[in-house]
C-alpha cells in the first residue's frame, strides 16, 4: 500500500525539502581548492564482500568463496602494511642498563618489557600472517595447477580470481620490502630479548617463548625472508611455472589494454610482473624464464622500459630492472640496456608533457562543463524533458574524465618515485640529510611550476566532477542498466537461440553458462520472460519488439563480478561462437569492466586523486634516524612557498591546491593508517605552514598594492622618462591575480573552515600600522627637510589602504593614523609628527639654517654654533615600507632628493597638509614661546651689556670726511663690538633664531592664504558665488546660505517630497542631507573678517617686547626731541651690529656674517626696531646708510677693494631692510601720525625748545584721546599731558585685535608714551589674502 504524501505527515517533509532546494547554499566564491568530502549515504556499497553470493546459482560460486577469503586477507594485510610502514622505534626513548651492578636494573628491564611487549606481539602476528598468506596463496596455485589443461593452456579460474592473486603477491612484495627497510624492528626486538633474558626466571613458558623469539629474530634479521619462503613453497608445487605465467600475462594484458582506473591498480600490475618472474626463475635449467614458452620476455621488456621506476608505498619506490636482475637467469641481451638513463625516462618528468596536458585539460573541462550545463537546463525545463546528449555519451565523457585523472595522478606519483630513485648528489649542495637531496634540491623551479599546475588541474577537475555527481549518478545508473539489459535481452538472447539451434545436444556447459548469465542479470519489463513469437507463414523471420524498463537500478558488486566472470568464461570459448557474437561479448566486457568505478563515482575520484604519498617520508626518517623533518623539506610546503615566491601571476590562484595535499595526508593517517600521532604531526606542520603562508601572502598582497599605489602616485611624464632611460617598464604595477584569492571566506583544511579574507584583513591592519610607524620613525630620525618624504609616504599608505579596502574590511585610515601618530593617546593628544616638527623648528631649524630672501628658502648654515643634535636612530631600511620595490624607491628618492637641501614653501605646504589647521596653534605657540625665552633669557642681558659698551659719542661724521674717513671713523668706534667674544655664537646666533622663526611664520601664513583661496575657488560655485554676483552683492540682513544653490535646491526638493509622501520612502534621510548642506555652506562660506596668522604672530611678538621695551628705548633726550650725538636706544646698537656685519673679511676663505646667519638676522633686527617704534630714526642715523649716502654724494668714488666690498654688503642689507620694513608695515602699520610744530626760541639764549602740538584733523585728536584713556586705565602711574609730549621715544604701533583665536597678548609694560618724528608713515597697502566676503 502506497502512502500519499499529500494526505500524510510526510507531505510536510516533502514541502520542507522543496524549500531547501531554493536556498542558496553556494556563494559566489571561486573554487580554488579541492572539493571538501561530504557526509552521505553511498548507495553502491562495495563492502559486502560477496556475502550475497548465495542468491546467484553459478558454477563460479565456489570461486567467490576463495575471493572472499582473499579479500579478508588483503584487508588484514593492509593493516600490517600500515603498521610496519608507520612503525617508530620505541627503544630510542627507553632507559638502558649501563652496568651490571646498577641498582634499578630490574625496574628498568620490567619497564622495557612492559612497553615493548605489545609491539613485539604485533611483530609476531605479522610473522604468522605472512606464513598463513603464503600458505593460502600456494593452496590456490596448487588448486589451479590441478585444473591446468596443457593442450589448451587454460585453467579453471576467472580474471577476477587472478586479479586477487595479483593483489596477494603485491601484498607480500610490499610487506617484504617494508620489513627490509625498517631496521628499528630489530632494534626494538633486541631490547625486548635483553629484557626477556633477564626476567626469564620470573616468567612461565620461557622455552616456548624462546623458540618463538628465535623464529621472530630470524624472520626480522634475514632480508627478503618473505619472498624466499614464498619462492621455496612455490617450487614444491607441480606445474606452478605454468600457472604463474598466466598471472604475468594477465598483468601485461591489463597494462596494454589500460584495463585499470586507479593509479594503485596500475602500479600493482607493474610491481607484480617482475616479482612473479623472480619467483618462477631458479638456478636449475627446468625453471628458466628465458626458456618458458608461456613467457614473452620482449613483451615484458617493453613495459619495463616504459615504466622503469614504480612507486612502492609512501616514499618508497622500486626499480623494475633491479627486481628482474635478481633472477638467476637474467640475460641483459634479452632484456636490453638499462632504462634508468634512457630517453623513455623523460616521460617521468611532467614538464615535458605539460603543454599537451594543459590543452587536454582545457578541452575536457569545457566539454564536461557544457554537458553538465545542458543537463541542468533540461532538468529545469521539466522532469520528462529529453536530455540534449545521449546517455551513453554522458557515460563515455564521465569515464574519460576518470581516465584522465588516473593518468595525471599516475604521472605525479611516478615522477615522485623517479625523484626518489635519482637524488641530487651535487657535492656543492648543503644538504643536512638525504631527504633534502630527493625532494628539496631535486626539483627545479620549472619542475615545481609544472607540478603545481598539474596538481591544480587534477584537483579542480575532480572537484567539478564530484560537484556534478548527484546530477550524473542517476543517469549513469540508468545507462548501465540499459546497456546490461540490451546485452542480455537482445544480444545474449539471440546468441542463446543461435547456439541452441546449432548445437541441440552438445556443449551443455556453454548453454548453462549463458543461461546463468541471463538469469543473473535480466530485468524483464513485465517481470517474467515473454513467450517467443510464432513466425508468420509468409516469412520465417520473427520481428520482436523488446521492451526494456527504464530503471536506475545497477547490478550489485557481487552480481557485477559474476556477470564479468561468466562473460570472460564465454570469451575463453571463442571457437564456439561466431565473430559477431564474440565481438558482442568483447564489447560488453570492455564496457562492463568500468561499471564499478562509475557506480561509485565519488569514492573512485577520491581514490584516484589521492596524492598523500607526496608527503609521507617514513623510509627517509628511518634512513636518516630522525623523528621528523623540518617543513622546509616537505613537498607540499615547498610547492606552496614556490607559488608565493614566484613572479608568475597565474600560479597564485593555485595556492591552496598544494596545501590541500595535507587533507589527503590526514585522511590516510586517520582512516587508512589509523595512526593518531601521524595526524598530530600533520596538523602541527600544517599549522606552521599556514602561519608562514599568512605571513608571506600578507606581505605579498601588501607589496602588490603598495607598488600599485606608488605607480599611481608617481608623476606620469617623470615615470615615462625614467622607464625610457633606466627601468624599462619596471615602474608599472606587476600583473597579479589576487582578486580570486582575496575573496575566499571559507578555505577547508583538515576539516576546518578558515576565513582567509578575515585573517588577511587582520594582518593588513597590522602592516598598515607598521608602515605608518616606519614612516613616522624615519621622519623622527631626520631633520625638517624630510617632511616632504613623510607626506609622500603617508599619501602612498593612504592610497594603499584605499586599494586594500576594496577587498578587506579594515579599520578607517584616520583612526589608524591617529593611533600610530599617538594623537589620541592618554600620553599626548598632539601627535608624534607635530611634536617632532616643533622640536626641529626650535632645536635645528631656527639656530642652524640661513634664510635667503630672493629664493625664499632656508638652507643649512655652513657653520653652526650649536652642539650636534641627537635624534632617534634611523630604522632599518625596508624597501616594501618605502614605496614597494627598489625601482620605485629609486624613482621616488630622485624626486624627494630635490627637497632635501633646503626648507621652503613646499615643506611648509607639507606641514600644513599633514598636521592640519587644528595643530597650528600648538606649533605657533611653541615657536613664540621659544622667541620669548630667547629675548628674555639670552638677548636681554647681551643687549644691555652691548649698549653699555657702545661709544660715548656716535655722532655721524660730516660729508667732508668722505667715505674713507667716515668708514675709518666707524671702524675705530666699533672695534670693541667687532671683537666681542660672544658676538657670533650668542648675540647674532640669537638674532638669527628670532628672525628665522618670524620668517617661518610669514611663509606659513602665505601658504595658509593660498590654501584658503584654492578651497574658496572650489566651493564658490556651490555657494552661488561668481565674479558677477560677487561684485553686485549688497549688504543684507538675510542669511546668504538660504540663497546658495547647494542648500536651496535640496530644500526645495525636501519640501516637494514632504507634500507627496507616497513618493519619498525615507524622508528622514533627505532631511539629514538638507542639514548637512546647511553645515557645509556655513563651513565653506568665507567670513567678512580677513584672518592672518602672521598678523597675530606679530601682535604677540609686540607684546613679548613689552618686557624689554623700557630698557631698549633708552633715556629721554636732553633737548626733548632727539639725541643726535649719542643714544642708548636699540636702533643705535643694531646700527653698530649692522656695520660689523658689513665689515669686509680679512681672509677670503672666511665666511661673512651674512653667509653664516642669512637674512633671518635682518628680520630679527628690523622687527625689533619696528615694534620698538624706532624705524625712521634707524633709517636716519644708521651708520651704513650714512656711508652709502656719503659715497653717493661724493664726486669721486672710492676704488679700494675693502670699501667696495663694504658698499656692496651695505647696499644688500639696506635693500633687505626696506623689504622687511615694507612687509611689517603692511601687516602691522604704526598708529596715525601727528605733526610736530617746532617754534623758534624767544631769545637766542633759550635753553630748550617749546613744543606745542596742534591737531589738524578732529578725527586724529579723538583717536589719540581714546588711546590715552586706554593707557591710563592699564597703568595708573602714567602721567603727563597729551599736548606736551617728550620726544625721547615714539610709541610703538599698537597690535591689531586678535582675529585668529590665539590668546590675547599680556598687558603692555609701563612706559611713557611720546610722539616723535617716527610716528609718520604712509597709509599701508591692503593685505593680500582671500577675496573680501560679500557684505551681509
From Swiss-Prot:
Disruption phenotype: Cells have no developmental defects, but cells are abnormally large and show a highly motile phenotype. Residues 1262-1336 are annotated as: Disordered. One of its GO terms (cellular component) is SCAR complex. It holds the Pfam family CYRIA-B_Rac1-bd. Residues 1262-1289 have a biased composition (Low complexity). Part of a Scar/WAVE complex containing brk1, scrA, abiA, pirA and napA. PANTHER family: CYTOPLASMIC FMR1-INTERACTING PROTEIN-RELATED. This is Protein pirA. It comes from Dictyostelium discoideum. The lineage of its organism: Eukaryota, Amoebozoa, Evosea, Eumycetozoa, Dictyostelia. The gene is pirA.
Amino acid at each position: 500500500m502506497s502512502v500519499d504524501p499529500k494526505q500524510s505527515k510526510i507531505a510536510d517533509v516533502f514541502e520542507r525539502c522543496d524549500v531547501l532546494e531554493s536556498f542558496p547554499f553556494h556563494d559566489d566564491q571561486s573554487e580554488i581548492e579541492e572539493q571538501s568530502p561530504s557526509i552521505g549515504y553511498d548507495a553502491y556499497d562495495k563492502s559486502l564482500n560477496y556475502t550475497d553470493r548465495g542468491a546467484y546459482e553459478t558454477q563460479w560460486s565456489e570461486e567467490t568463496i576463495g575471493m572472499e577469503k582473499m579479500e579478508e586477507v588483503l584487508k588484514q594485510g593492509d593493516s600490517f602494511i600500515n603498521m610496519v610502514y608507520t612503525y617508530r622505534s620505541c627503544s630510542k626513548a627507553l632507559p638502558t642498563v649501563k652496568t651490571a651492578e646498577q641498582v634499578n636494573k630490574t625496574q628498568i628491564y620490567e619497564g622495557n618489557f612492559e612497553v615493548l611487549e605489545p609491539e613485539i606481539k604485533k611483530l609476531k602476528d605479522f610473522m604468522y600472517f605472512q606464513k598463513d598468506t603464503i600458505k593460502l596463496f600456494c593452496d590456490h596455485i596448487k588448486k589451479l595447477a590441478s585444473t591446468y589443461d596443457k593442450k589448451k593452456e587454460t585453467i579453471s579460474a576467472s580474471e577476477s580470481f587472478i586479479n586477487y592473486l595479483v593483489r596477494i603477491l603485491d601484498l607480500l612484495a610490499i610487506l617484504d620490502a617494508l620489513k627490509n627497510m625498517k631496521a628499528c624492528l630489530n632494534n626494538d626486538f633486541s631490547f625486548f630479548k635483553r629484557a626477556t633474558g633477564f626476567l626469564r626466571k620470573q616468567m612461565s613458558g620461557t622455552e616456548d617463548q624462546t623458540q618463538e623469539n628465535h623464529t621472530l629474530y630470524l624472520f626480522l634479521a634475514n632480508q627478503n625472508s618473505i619472498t624466499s619462503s614464498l619462492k621455496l613453497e612455490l617450487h614444491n608445487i607441480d606445474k606452478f611455472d605454468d600457472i604463474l605465467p598466466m598471472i604475468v600475462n594477465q598483468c601485461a594484458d591489463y597494462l596494454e589494454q589500460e584495463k585499470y582506473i586507479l593509479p594503485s591498480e596500475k602500479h600493482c600490475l607493474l610491481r607484480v610482473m617482475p616479482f612473479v618472474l623472480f619467483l618462477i626463475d631458479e638456478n636449475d635449467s627446468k625453471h628458466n624464464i628465458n626458456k618458458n614458452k608461456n613467457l614473452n620476455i620482449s613483451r615484458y621488456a617493453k613495459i619495463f622500459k616504459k615504466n622503469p621506476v614504480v612507486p612502492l608505498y609512501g616514499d618508497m619506490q622500486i626499480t623494475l630492472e633491479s627486481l628482474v636482475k635478481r633472477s638467476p637467469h637474467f640475460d641483459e641481451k634479452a632484456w636490453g640496456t638499462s632504462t634508468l638513463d634512457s630517453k623513455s625516462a623523460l616521460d617521468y618528468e611532467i614538464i615535458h608533457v605539460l603543454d599537451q596536458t594543459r590543452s587536454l585539460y582545457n578541452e575536457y573541462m569545457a566539454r564536461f562543463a557544457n554537458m553538465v550545463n545542458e543537463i541542468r537546463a533540461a532538468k529545469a525545463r521539466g522532469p520528462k524533458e529529453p536530455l540534449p546528449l545521449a546517455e551513453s555519451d554522458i557515460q563515455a565523457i564521465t569515464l574519460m574524465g576518470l581516465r584522465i585523472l588516473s593518468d595525471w595522478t599516475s604521472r605525479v606519483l611516478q615522477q615522485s618515485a623517479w625523484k626518489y630513485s635519482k637524488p641530487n648528489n651535487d657535492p656543492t649542495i648543503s644538504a643536512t640529510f638525504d631527504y633534502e637531496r630527493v625532494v628539496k634540491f631535486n626539483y627545479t623551479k620549472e619542475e615545481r611550476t609544472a607540478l603545481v599546475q598539474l596538481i591544480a588541474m587534477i584537483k579542480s577537475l575532480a572537484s567539478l566532477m564530484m560537484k556534478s555527481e548527484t546530477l550524473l549518478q542517476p543517469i549513469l545508473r540508468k545507462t548501465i542498466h540499459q546497456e546490461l539489459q540490451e546485452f542480455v535481452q537482445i544480444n545474449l538472447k539471440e546468441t542463446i537461440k543461435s547456439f541452441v539451434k546449432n548445437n541441440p545436444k552438445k556443449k551443455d556447459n556453454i548453454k548453462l553458462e549463458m543461461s546463468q548469465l541471463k538469469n543473473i542479470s535480466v530485468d524483464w519489463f513485465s517481470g517474467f520472460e515473454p513467450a517467443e513469437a510464432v513466425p508468420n507463414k509468409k516469412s520465417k523471420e520473427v520481428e520482436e519488439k523488446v521492451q526494456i524498463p527504464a530503471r536506475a537500478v545497477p547490478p550489485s558488486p557481487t552480481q557485477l563480478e559474476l556477470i564479468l566472470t561468466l562473460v570472460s568464461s564465454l570469451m575463453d570459448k571463442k571457437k564456439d561462437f561466431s565473430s559477431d557474437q564474440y565481438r558482442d561479448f568483447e564489447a560488453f566486457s570492455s564496457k562492463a569492466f568500468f561499471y564499478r568505478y562509475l557506480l561509485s563515482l565519488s569514492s573512485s575520484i577520491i581514490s584516484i586523486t589521492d596524492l598523500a604519498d607526496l608527503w609521507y617520508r617514513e623510509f627517509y626518517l628511518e634512513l636518516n634516524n630522525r623523528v621528523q623533518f623540518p617543513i622546509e623539506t616537505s613537498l607540499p610546503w615547498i610547492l606552496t612557498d614556490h607559488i608565493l615566491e614566484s613572479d608568475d601571476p597565474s600560479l597564485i590562484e593555485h595556492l591552496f591546491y598544494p596545501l590541500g595535499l595535507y587533507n589527503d595526508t590526514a585522511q590516510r593517517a586517520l582512516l587508512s593508517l589509523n595512526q593518531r600521532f601521524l595526524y598530530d604531526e600533520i596538523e602541527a606542520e600544517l599549522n606552521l605552514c599556514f602561519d608562514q603562508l599568512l605571513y608571506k601572502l600578507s606581505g605579498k598582497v601588501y607589496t602588490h598594492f603598495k607598488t600599485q599605489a606608488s605607480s599611481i602616485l608617481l608623476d606620469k611624464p617623470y615615470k615615462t622618462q625614467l622607464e625610457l632611460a633606466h627601468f624599462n617598464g619596471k615602474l608599472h604595477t606587476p600583473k597579479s591575480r589576487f582578486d580570486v584569492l582575496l575573496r575566499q571566506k571559507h578555505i577547508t583544511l583538515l576539516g576546518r573552515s578558515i576565513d582567509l579574507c578575515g585573517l588577511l584583513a587582520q594582518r593588513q591592519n597590522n602592516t598598515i600600522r607598521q608602515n605608518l610607524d616606519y614612516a613616522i620613525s624615519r621622519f623622527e630620525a631626520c631633520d625638517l627637510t624630510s617632511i616632504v618624504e613623510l607626506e609622500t609616504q603617508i599619501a602612498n599608505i593612504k592610497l594603499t589602504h584605499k586599494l586594500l579596502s576594496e577587498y578587506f574590511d579594515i579599520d578607517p585610515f584616520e583612526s589608524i593614523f591617529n593611533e600610530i601618530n599617538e594623537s589620541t593617546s592618554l600620553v599626548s593628544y598632539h601627535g608624534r609628527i607635530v611634536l617632532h616638527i616643533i622640536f626641529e623648528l626650535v632645536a635645528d631649524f631656527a639656530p642652524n639654517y640661513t634664510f635667503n630672501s630672493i629664493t625664499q628658502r632656508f638652507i643649512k648654515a655652513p657653520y653652526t654654533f650649536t652642539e650636534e643634535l641627537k635624534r632617534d636612530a634611523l630604522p632599518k631600511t625596508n624597501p616594501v615600507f618605502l614605496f614597494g620595490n627598489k625601482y620605485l624607491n629609486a624613482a621616488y628618492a630622485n624626486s624627494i632628493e630635490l627637497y632635501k637641501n633646503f626648507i621652503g614653501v613646499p615643506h611648509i605646504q607639507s606641514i600644513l597638509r599633514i598636521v592640519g589647521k587644528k595643530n597650528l596653534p600648538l606649533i605657533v605657540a611653541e615657536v613664540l614661546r621659544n622667541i620669548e625665552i630667547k629675548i628674555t633669557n639670552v638677548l636681554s642681558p647681551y643687549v644691555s651689556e652691548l649698549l653699555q659698551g657702545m661709544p660715548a659719542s656716535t655722532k655721524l661724521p660730516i660729508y667732508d670726511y668722505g667715505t674713507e674717513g667716515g668708514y675709518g671713523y666707524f671702524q675705530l668706534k666699533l672695534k670693541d663690538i667687532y671683537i666681542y667674544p660672544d658676538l657670533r655664537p650668542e648675540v647674532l646666533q640669537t638674532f638669527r633664531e628670532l628672525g628665522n622663526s618670524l620668517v617661518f611664520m610669514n611663509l606659513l601664513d602665505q601658504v595658509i592664504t593660498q590654501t584658503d583661496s584654492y578651497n574658496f575657488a572650489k566651493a564658490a560655485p556651490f555657494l552661488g558665488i561668481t565674479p558677477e554676483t560677487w561684485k553686485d552683492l549688497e549688504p543684507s540682513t538675510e542669511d546668504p546660505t538660504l540663497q546658495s544653490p547647494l542648500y536651496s535646491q535640496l530644500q526645495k526638493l525636501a519640501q516637494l517630497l514632504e507634500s507627496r509622501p507616497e513618493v519619498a520612502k525615507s524622508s528622514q534621510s533627505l532631511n539629514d542631507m538638507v542639514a548637512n548642506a546647511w553645515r557645509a555652506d556655513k563651513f565653506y562660506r568665507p567670513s567678512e573678517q580677513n584672518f592672518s596668522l602672521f598678523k597675530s604672530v606679530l601682535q604677540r611678538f609686540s607684546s613679548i617686547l613689552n618686557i624689554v621695551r623700557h630698557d631698549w628705548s633708552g633715556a629721554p633726550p636732553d633737548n626733548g626731541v632727539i639725541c643726535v650725538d649719542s643714544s642708548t636706544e636699540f636702533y643705535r646698537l643694531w646700527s653698530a651690529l649692522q656695520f660689523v656685519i658689513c665689515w669686509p673679511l680679512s681672509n677670503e676663505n672666511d665666511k661673512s656674517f651674512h653667509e653664516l646667519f642669512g637674512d633671518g638676522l635682518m628680520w630679527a633686527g628690523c622687527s625689533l626696531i619696528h615694534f620698538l617704534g624706532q624705524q625712521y630714526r634707524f633709517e636716519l642715523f644708521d651708520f651704513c646708510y650714512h656711508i652709502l649716502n656719503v659715497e653717493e654724494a661724493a664726486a669721486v668714488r672710492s676704488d679700494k677693494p675693502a670699501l667696495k666690498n663694504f658698499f656692496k654688503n651695505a647696499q644688500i642689507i639696506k635693500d633687505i631692510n626696506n623689504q622687511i620694513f615694507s612687509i611689517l608695515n603692511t601687516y602691522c602699520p604704526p598708529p596715525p601720525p601727528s605733526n610736530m610744530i617746532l617754534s623758534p626760541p624767544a631769545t637766542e639764549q633759550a635753553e630748550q625748545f617749546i613744543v606745542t602740538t596742534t591737531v589738524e584733523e578732529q578725527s586724529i585728536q579723538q583717536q589719540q584721546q581714546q588711546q590715552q584713556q586706554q593707557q591710563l586705565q592699564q597703568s595708573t602711574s602714567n602721567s603727563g599731558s597729551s599736548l606736551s609730549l617728550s620726544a625721547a621715544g615714539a610709541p610703538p604701533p599698537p597690535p591689531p585685535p586678535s582675529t585668529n583665536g590665539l590668546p590675547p597678548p599680556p598687558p603692555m609694560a609701563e612706559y611713557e608714551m611720546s610722539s616723535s618724528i617716527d610716528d609718520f608713515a604712509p597709509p599701508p597697502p591692503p593685505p593680500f589674502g582671500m577675496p573680501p566676503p560679500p557684505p551681509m
